[in-house]
Amino acid sequence: MVCTVAVGGASAAPGAAGGAAAAGGTAAKPLPAELEKIRAREADRLYGDPAERPLGERKTSLISLGDSEISGEGVGTYEPGTDGPDNWCHRSPDAAIHRTGIGADVTYNAACSGAGSGNIVIGGSKQYADELVQSDSLAIAARNTRLKMVLLVAGANDDLQFGPVMTDCVTRWFLFQGTCEPKYQPGWQARVDGLVPKVERTVGDLRTVMRDAGYADGDYRLVVMSYPSPIGPDVEDNPRYPGKLPGGCTGYTSDAGWGRNAAVPAFENGVRKAARDSGATYLDASRLFHGHEVCMEDTWARGLYVNLTNPFPPNSNSVRQSFHPNARGHGAFASCLTQLYASGLREAACADPASTGQPKLYPEAWDDAYRPLKNTGTGSCVDATGGASRNGTVVGGWDCHGQRNQGWWYDPEQRSLHVELTQDRCLDVPGGRYAAGAGLVLWNCSGTDNQRFVRADGGTIRPAAAPSLCLTLAGAKEPLRLQGCDGSAGQRFA
């Protein structure tokens, strides 16, 4: 079953029945009889008759495939027949695919909560009796409409088993069993390495489905999107922090840090590799929810949620909505996808640059954006002390080691310096005190003047509001301070 939402467009004139040619003139291969019956029935709903039309005479469409991250799990409103008891796909009418600004007459959401690559690939298995293998849903949509974008979000339910790991981490917190990082970190990269070929195969199979439907590879966009982190360790910086139980950010704070700083970045690297190696367009959403995690301001993810009435009596399905994008999160996905489609980029990243709630697209993956700031005079690197990212964390010098608390990205539009730990913490002059000797800290990115810096010739970095002052490291492990610019090596960074 595929959820279809018509969002406008007039009925096209019928063409010859079966095998209609695509833009490049390639005829579609016939579907198996069972799928052809479904295709004809859906064509009749779309156009008033079951004929398969030439590509140029069809309604335009978008489709999403994958798992709970993109199906709408966590939104809370679900399509009939996908909210139990026999089908838990949890497809939401508020899912991202239905909310983009990409012009399309029809949007399809074939994604299903819990799906692994084996539920998507050609010849794969159905998740539920009333479901199709997702590649079969794509084959039908590709013949009834003119697909403009195919979105795939997959990998979490393969070797990674992200959901069970998350459940175990939360359970260990409730039962005082200790953190889960020591249990999972040693084998995490092996899990990532295992999922990469599965995602690559999935992309390849989707290409095959589209070619069999008569499409050339350039007739549509095939987008692979990575997963954002729903949790983070800085929740107590929220001035309205509700507490872990009321807010649903249950789990050890250090595990939330491991998830944000290690587990999700490794996963993102794997998804990116799969996208690049298979020739898909890649959207890096790994930092999209930074500053919008569970228990933060304007959260874009749902925290721990227990549905006591569906199912009843409660079972494992009662908590399946937990730690998934909420409606605002899907709105953020939709914005990023809209910008990506319009850009024509083959690889891009998306994030909220300054706590605006408005995602922005950048023409690179985040892996390539962050670099150390090495001081010419001391040879040490600018470092967020102790690997922390709480508001007020002191920034200073330390031996260069390549970890994420020494990675920095300069946003030329905002003129802000973001630490790699989180897109939501920027270098900050506390209180806008522009004076010699003033120390610098991390603070929630806001786009205000005390977070704006100018990278000048010669490697100096100066507050935009006080260009006579320079960031200075007086010693290899001294705090980073403002001092009058004097041209010394301690004020130059490479």
How would you label these PLM feature ranges?
Residues 61-73, 106-111, 148-153, 158-160, ...:
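Structural recognition of the beta-strand scaffold that forms the well-ordered cores
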Residues 136-309, 313:
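Alpha-helical cap/lid subdomain in secreted, periplasmic
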Residues 40-113, 170-171:
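Serine-esterase "nucleophile elbow" of acetyl-processing enzymes
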